[in-house]
Amino acid sequence: MKFSSIPIASTLLSLLVASSVTASPLRRRDDPLNGRQFGLLALHSGNEYVHLHGFYVGDSGSVYLDPADGTDDAATFTMSNGQLSVGNRYASVSANGEIVFKSDTNSTSSGFSVGEAISSGYSLKYNGTESAVACPSLVNNQVYQVFFGVGNGNPSCVGIAVLAVLPQPISSSSTYNSTTSSYHNSTSTPPPTITSTKASTVTSTEATTVTTTTAVTVTATETYTVTATNGGSTITSTGASTVTSTQPSTVTSTQRKNTATTTKTTTYVGPSPSASSVVAYTTKCIVVPVITTAASQSEAATPSPSAAVYPLFPHGIRLIDSTKPEANSGNVYSPVVFQKQNNHTNTIFTFDVPQVSGSCELNFHLDTSGFPITVEGVNGTGRFILFNLSSVANDSTVYSNRPNRIAEIGRFNCSSSGCDYATNVTCPDSYTAVSYEMMALTDDSYLSFFEEADPLEGLTLRV
């Protein structure tokens, strides 16, 4: 499945931080990064080689999203008068947008600036735009190189947003302009330090023979811990991914012990997310199959289509507020749904759609294994409803011009323990985009959460 390469500047990115129920930026002093050290993160939902990867400056000065070119550590940057530097080397941007750090100051580029202030840092702009590009490097197509222009021509290049994150919490005495800010207030706390790695292990039983005349269910479970760390603070998220398939009656198979472990570390700099301050985390889930002998493989039933399809995560999440019909939330990281009498805060989710296989399913899942969720309602249960929309939300979508609703998709209840809901939907056309709206069904129903992949939390689409 190929994900869209549409740039996600200022998403996840303003996508990806929502500090309260709307994405209203904090007030900030001029040049907040001037003279301060910070890290840089690439943001692009759905690309495991790009999303939430730190910036590494190689020996040649080129910038990569993984260790490469003689460097093993994510770089620490400073910025002054529009010039971006690492140590005594300064960023120079070539005609095709390649960014290279050089000790020769004669070719230094001065077009870097601070974008929107968000609770975990600031978006980074070049020449007034946030449209950076990440492309597979010429040496290793799993290590991406950073460009602030057209890129190197590789068809797998993707647009990215660049997030500058300070190693300490951003101090601010400002309040959030939100109709429900009094409902949930946020406070800044020092970032914690947590260290671990991401490990995936699959083990099957040594020389075990199974014979049955009824249906046999085989389950593979991937347990994983994802850690993001770099100088400042660390995010750790743990969860599990399970694939289940049913084999036909009368099955005899022998399984061998086979253990495989992989480890991956992602760099993150900045304060730890909370229910009111989070960073976009929507990479692709990885499904690990059961390991069996050739004999058992020949008799195994074909897995169901849903088990073989990756979930799609929204590339855009927007809040619309009936009390501020012209307010533009921008793209946010944390969806919020709320109703108080006639006042609504709804969330619109937009997905990029690859090749459609035939049947489509919308899934909503929340539990307590990921970042904190907040659910309120009568007796602690909120009631919510989903709609499909007549058109796709865009950067100018607000409450007053929101797309029309075509029909109700379904209703679900949610509590502080979470919820799980799935429903078949009309498939969108291949290689297009589609939007869905979530709103509260009853008065005082409230829901906020963090869309993430490890563990899988939030709204996803399978096609």
Curated annotation (Swiss-Prot):
<dbReference type="InterPro" id="IPR018620">
    <property type="entry name" value="Ubiquitin3-bd_protein_But2_C"/>
</dbReference>
<feature type="region of interest" description="Disordered">
    <location>
        <begin position="174"/>
        <end position="200"/>
    </location>
</feature>
<comment type="similarity">
    <text>Belongs to the but2 family.</text>
</comment>
<protein>
    <recommendedName>
        <fullName>Uncharacterized but2-like protein C27D7.11c</fullName>
    </recommendedName>
</protein>
<keyword id="KW-0963">Cytoplasm</keyword>
<feature type="region of interest" description="Disordered">
    <location>
        <begin position="239"/>
        <end position="258"/>
    </location>
</feature>
<dbReference type="Pfam" id="PF09792">
    <property type="entry name" value="But2"/>
</dbReference>
<feature type="signal peptide">
    <location>
        <begin position="1"/>
        <end position="23"/>
    </location>
</feature>
<keyword id="KW-0732">Signal</keyword>
<dbReference type="GO" id="GO:0005737">
    <property type="term" value="C:cytoplasm"/>
</dbReference>
